[in-house]
Design a protein with these regions (language model features):
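Short beta-strand/loop motif that positions the catalytic acidic residue
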Residues: 216-218
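Short beta-strand element of the alpha/beta-hydrolase
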Residues: 98-107
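Primarily recognizes the serine-hydrolase "nucleophile elbow" in alpha/beta-hydrolase
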Residues: 153-211
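N-terminal secretory signal peptides
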Residues: 1-30
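Alpha/beta-hydrolase active-site loop
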Residues: 114, 140-163
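N-terminal cap/lid segment of alpha/beta-hydrolase-fold proteins
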Residues: 59-95
């Protein structure tokens, strides 16, 4: 990965443009048209898009066939006739007793190898990690947000009631998933720990319903972060037990080691805090 691009290789406005593309604000053609002015020195807009896009194989930290883990594809009922929804379940191979569970909520393009890798990392820290693909039944993103929320709540309840789970569960999510973790915290009073990475914030009215302790991670160069202070005021007003960190010089997606927006130092610190938080709240 030493020869891969970093955020220093790209104009900040291009990074914001890519963020719009990832979140559905513009389509591929719109990105290419607007990115053309940054394509210099023989580099095309299409090449810039490729450089900014995930490289899953290069960033894998834990192999899918790691013999320390037990992995399986599972399905669980999607509520209100939304059909079956699948997911990726990972446990330590040598686990002998019940484990606390962690719901791993994907970004806005659905379950992918990076999120599966995140689940494996958590399992190596002796958690049962479940990464549902809750957008699959909705035809991808954007879809019906209410149905997506219902599917993630169903996934959390499915995980919590497994006979090999202690019944204590947390949730971690990234981007779209960070916003969904915030939503789950407003909807699930029994959620024992919530960790949103750069996720959209709930309203002050919804924040007042949060019972879960929260660990909140933001990137400095991210429009979502500008709404962080209002969210923090709502958390304080609701007497929520929370910690909030903004990582200097980082971009939206700084924890995702498959793209140039990855910041290894910030990601390491944020992940260390995350695992410590789950150990404290779920054990």
């Amino acid at each position: 990965m030493n020869d891969r691009k970093t955020t220093k290789d790209f104009d900040q406005d291009l990074l914001h443009l890519f963020d719009q593309y990832v979140h559905g604000g513009i389509d591929r053609r719109g990105f290419l048209d607007r990115a053309a002015k940054y394509a210099v020195g023989g580099v095309t807009a299409a090449m810039l898009l490729d450089q900014l896009s995930p490289q899953f194989a290069e960033a894998q930290q834990v192999k899918p066939d790691d013999n320390r883990l037990k992995t399986e594809r599972v399905s669980y009922p999607s509520p209100n006739g939304n059909a079956k929804t699948g997911g990726y379940l990972v446990r330590p191979a040598n686990a002998t007793g019940k484990l606390p569970g962690i719901l791993v909520v994907h970004e806005n393009r659905g379950l992918n190898p990076h999120i599966e890798d995140i689940a494996r990392r958590l399992a190596l820290d002796n958690f049962m990690a479940f990464a549902p693909d809750a957008l699959a039944t909705l035809g991808g993103y954007p879809g019906d947000e209410e149905k997506a929320r219902e599917d993630f709540v169903a996934a959390a309840n499915w995980l919590k009631t497994r006979p090999d789970c202690t019944g204590k569960i947390g949730a971690v999510g990234f981007c779209y998933g960070g916003g969904m973790v915030n939503t789950l915290a407003t909807q699930m009073p029994d959620l024992a720990a919530a960790v949103p990475f750069y996720g959209n914030q709930p309203s002050a009215e919804d924040t007042a319903r949060i019972k879960s302790p929260m660990l909140i991670h933001y990137a400095e160069n991210d429009q979502i972060t500008t709404r962080g202070p209002a969210f923090e005021e709502a958390l304080k007003a609701a007497h929520v037990d929370y910690q909030m960190y903004t990582y200097k010089g980082t971009q939206h997606g700084f924890n995702n080691d498959t793209t140039p927006r990855y910041d290894p130092d910030a990601a390491k610190l944020a992940w260390t805090r995350t695992v410590e938080f789950f150990n404290k709240r779920l054990r």
